[in-house]
Curated annotation (Swiss-Prot):
Belongs to the V-ATPase D subunit family. InterPro entries: V_ATPase_D. It is found in: Membrane; Cytoplasmic vesicle, Clathrin-coated vesicle membrane; Cytoplasm, Cytoskeleton, Microtubule organizing center, Centrosome; Cell projection, Cilium. This is V-type proton ATPase subunit D. It is a peripheral membrane protein. Keywords: Cell projection, Cilium biogenesis/degradation, Cytoplasm, Cytoplasmic vesicle, Cytoskeleton, Hydrogen ion transport, Ion transport, Membrane, Transport. PANTHER family: V-TYPE ATP SYNTHASE SUBUNIT D (PTHR11671).
């Protein structure tokens, strides 16, 4: 396993604990991002469906508004000069709000009326009904246009947010988590190898001590058999174990 495939870290119990915590954190982050992506995708599909419905309705409303304009011009004559002369400031205005979906801020536009209707008395002489119908149809068209602008802006914002979230999920799932898992496997392998080496070393030391003990007991028996007087061992004296070397 090359160093590029795993995180450079000294194998130890502490490193193993750290890697386990990092792995758990990465898995939790991946799961949360997947839930976020699912929530964004659900809202994305809802907005897409709403855009299609609004565009279909928009076509009908604009067609009806065009017919109303033709009827009003036929009945009341050319009233464009009157409209232009009465223009002072916009009566229909737009304000923006913010909506939050799984941490993503979406702009929401809504229209509102400000001031009085400058064209309230237009059409009193003739064509009043057609002009009123014309204003209603174009007011509906403005409302749908504002709604469509809000939906399309949210659509683009969500599309970009979903792509970014999915890229993060893929990076965690296919790069970060496998790298941590390989690092954890490396640490476990190294620790197991150390334990085997330590076990083998202790086993050889015990075997060496056993051989020395048997040899010492055998020498003691031979000396007793030869009639030598043996001094009792001083239990309080400091004894230093002989360094045991083995091949």
């Amino acid at each position: 396993m090359s160093g590029k495939d795993r995180i450079e870290i000294f194998p130890s119990r502490m490193a193993q604990t750290i890697m386990k915590a990092r792995l758990k954190g990465a898995q939790t982050g991946r799961n949360l991002l997947k839930k976020k992506s699912d929530a964004l995708t659900l809202r994305f599909r809802q907005i897409l469906k709403k855009i299609i419905e609004t565009k279909m309705l928009m076509g009908e409303v604009m067609r009806e508004a065009a017919f109303s304009l033709a009827e009003a011009k036929f009945t009341a004559g050319d009233f464009s000069t009157t409209v232009i002369q009465n223009v002072n400031k916009a009566q229909v205005k737009i304000r923006a709000k913010k909506d939050n979906v799984a941490g993503v801020t979406l702009p929401v536009f809504e229209h509102y009326h400000e001031g009085t209707d400058s064209y309230e008395l237009t059409g009193l002489a003739r064509g009043g009904e057609q002009l009123a119908k014309l204003k209603r149809n174009y007011a509906k068209a403005v409302e749908l246009l504002v709604e469509l602008a809000s939906l399309q802006t949210s659509f683009v914002t969500l599309d970009e947010a979903i792509k970014i979230t999915n890229r993060r999920v893929n990076a965690i799932e296919h790069v970060i988590i496998p790298r941590i898992e390989r690092t954890l496997a490396y640490i476990i392998t190294e620790l197991d190898e150390r334990e085997r080496e330590e076990f083998y070393r202790l086993k050889k030391i015990q075997e060496k001590k056993k051989i020395l003990k048997e040899k010492s007991e055998k020498d003691l028996e031979q000396r007793r058999a030869a009639g030598e007087v043996l001094e009792p061992a001083n239990l309080l004296a400091e004894e230093k174990d002989e360094d045991l070397l083995f091949e």
